[in-house]
Structure formats: structure tokens, C-alpha cells
Amino acid sequence: MDHLPQLVAEARAAIESAEDVQSLDEVRVRYLGKKGEITALLKGLGKLPAEERPKAGEQINDAKQVLSDELEARKKHLQDAELNARLAQERIDVTLPGRGEPTGGLHPVTRTLERIESLFAHIGFDVAVGPELEDDYHNFEALNIPAHHPARGMADTFYFDASRLLRTHTSPVQVRTMKEQAPPIRIVCPGRVYRSDSDLTHTPMFHQVEGLLVDEDVSFADLKGTIEDFLKAFFERESLSVRFRPSYFPFTEPSAEVDIQCVMCGGDGCRVCSHSGWLEVMGCGMVHPEVFRHSGIDAERYTGFAFGMGAERLTMLRYGVNDLRLFFENDLRFLRQFG
């Protein structure tokens, strides 16, 4: 018992000099472990006279408590120091720019659709939509294409049954709008349409935008000016040459195909324009009186014009893409070029 103070002093010095948690644990085992030097004193209490044992036991337990407290305090100090050292090595410079997360972008066809809608919105056109699953009446008959009409052969149609089909154009939206809304009417009708065709320039599903203007005293000159201004704005070429060729559509009379000067060669002739210097981009015409009759509009009072264009076709020309199918293959290497 006489050397207890000396053991405590040695243990405290060893605790203070321990440089890491492992060394500190070795000090604990040496003095307070099952075979530790101070623990051994407790085992030797039986050799003391009975009257000295309580006091000696109390002194040993006090010494153990003091050393346990100092061991715990030293351990916390060493752990904090170790953590601070590790944090210093792993320090993050918060002034560095963060890592950007990859973000998606609009599909090129979606960009084209939004651009078309925006350009026509600037001149007072609203956007109208309708069902993709159509009935025979709105898709054909109301557009002056009755049963057995030769024009029905222009589109290989996906039929569900004798009266239901996937729409072959967005013109039915025009009919539905004219039935529900009195003139004046100014709308563009973007949407998916379906035809049984697939090659470099055709897909079974594609996007079409059709437009309609109905009012009093609307003339072909109004149609011509609207189309020319739109195409120059869309392709961002004020000097773009536009021409109108007589054509035939059952729902317009007169009708015309619209060509623009080839945006690839500037009209000099190239593979894209078949060396003609011109590219066909849309069809148009004055609304046929029969379409007005089916829609409940007085053809004696009102006139109007309609036009239609393929969004993929315009996208190909705007971005220089030579295969329509690329827009639907979901190849990110291709699509990222437009992000």
C-alpha cells in the first residue's frame, strides 16, 4: 500500500505521454486491467490486518477512479486531435466551383414545334389541339373527302374499325374548332399524326402543324403574306425566296405547294434539293366551301385559308439532318447536339 501514490504518479505520467489511442489503451491495461498493477493491490487486501482493509480499499478505488477519469479525458483529447488532423488533410475548398449535374434538353422536333407556335402567337394565332384517335367523319368526310374519294389513297391509314382510326393529319382539329367557335378564328394545330410509311424521309408517326384563319374578306394574298413572313422568320433569312405552285388538296380551293430556296446550297443546286435549287416545305390554300358547310360556317359571308407543314421536315432543313429516322432512335450522341 505504501507504493500506491508512486503507482498513481507513474500511471498519470504514462497517460499524459500517450501519443495515440492504442498507446493509451496499453497504459490502461498495465495499471487497471485484470492483471494491472493497481488491480493487484485490491487482490492483496487480504494480507492486511482487518482494521486496515476498509481504508486501504477506499484509497485503491479512489486511485482507480482518478486514473479512469484521466484515461477517458486523454482518450477524448487524442480522438479529437486525430479527427482534426484527418479533416485538415481532407479539407474542402468551398470557393471551388461545384460539379454541375448533367441536364437534359429539348428534343429538336419539340424545339421546332415551340418555335412555330411562338412565331404564330406573335401574329395573334392560338394553339388548338384534338384527339389522335379520330373518327372517319372528322378525318375525312368533313374535310371534303367522302367515302371512295380518290384522295383517300393519299394516306395509308391505321384503322381500328370501320369508323375509328389514327388521324392522318391535324386538320380534324380545325373542323372541331370551327364547330365550337364562331369567326374570326386564328389557330395553329400541332400534334402527332400517323401514316403507314417508313423510309429515309417518312416515319409511321410524325408531327404536323396545321393552321387556319377564318374571317370576312380573307384572300389568297393574306395567305401568301402570312406564309412568306413565317418562313423568313423561321429560317432567320429575310432574303429567303419563297414560291407557290398550284396543287390539289380536297379541303382547299385554290391550293398550292410552298417551296423555299434551298437552305443548303442557296439555290445553286445540290443533292438535298435534287439540284433544283428549291425545297418543298408545306401545302396551303383557301378553305373549301364544303368544309365550311360541314363546320356550320356561312361560306357566303366568311372566307379563310389553311396550311400544313411537317415539323420533322422543317427540323431537318433547319439543322441539316439528312435522315428523318434519327429523330426517333433516341441516340443521345445525336440528341446532345441540340441541347
UniProtKB/Swiss-Prot annotation:
Keywords: Aminoacyl-tRNA synthetase, ATP-binding, Cytoplasm, Ligase, Magnesium, Metal-binding, Nucleotide-binding, Protein biosynthesis. It comes from Chromohalobacter salexigens (strain ATCC BAA-138 / DSM 3043 / CIP 106854 / NCIMB 13768 / 1H11). HAMAP family: Phe_tRNA_synth_alpha1. Tetramer of two alpha and two beta subunits. Mg(2+) binds at E253. This is Phenylalanine--tRNA ligase alpha subunit. Belongs to the class-II aminoacyl-tRNA synthetase family. Phe-tRNA synthetase alpha subunit type 1 subfamily. One of its GO terms (cellular component) is cytoplasm. It catalyses: tRNA(Phe) + L-phenylalanine + ATP = L-phenylalanyl-tRNA(Phe) + AMP + diphosphate + H(+). It is found in: Cytoplasm. Disulfide bonds: none annotated. Its EC number is 6.1.1.20. It comes from the Bacteria.
